[in-house]
């Protein structure tokens, strides 16, 4: 198999890796209970989505 003929510089390596970072989680507050949840998903604490109760959540007390 062919091998690289010339060595790549640190700048070229870093330019290639510029898009390899992780993006932070975009959590938003639930309008019903106020706890943080992922957007476009059912709240795991109160079970609501877009103002409607979708799932029944048992209290973890």
Swiss-Prot record:
Is the keyword Ion transport in the record? no
Give the record's keywords alphabetically.
Ribonucleoprotein, Ribosomal protein
Q: What Gene Ontology terms for biological process does this UniProt record contain? A: translation
Highest taxon in the source lineage: Bacteria
Its cellular-component GO annotations read: large ribosomal subunit
The protein's GO terms of the molecular function aspect are:
structural constituent of ribosome
Q: Does the keyword Ribonucleoprotein apply?
A: yes
**PANTHER family in UniProt:** 50S RIBOSOMAL PROTEIN L32 (PTHR35534), LARGE RIBOSOMAL SUBUNIT PROTEIN BL32 (PTHR35534:SF1)
Q: Which family does it belong to?
A: Belongs to the bacterial ribosomal protein bL32 family.
**Name of the protein described by the UniProt record:** Large ribosomal subunit protein bL32
Q: Which gene encodes it?
A: rpmF
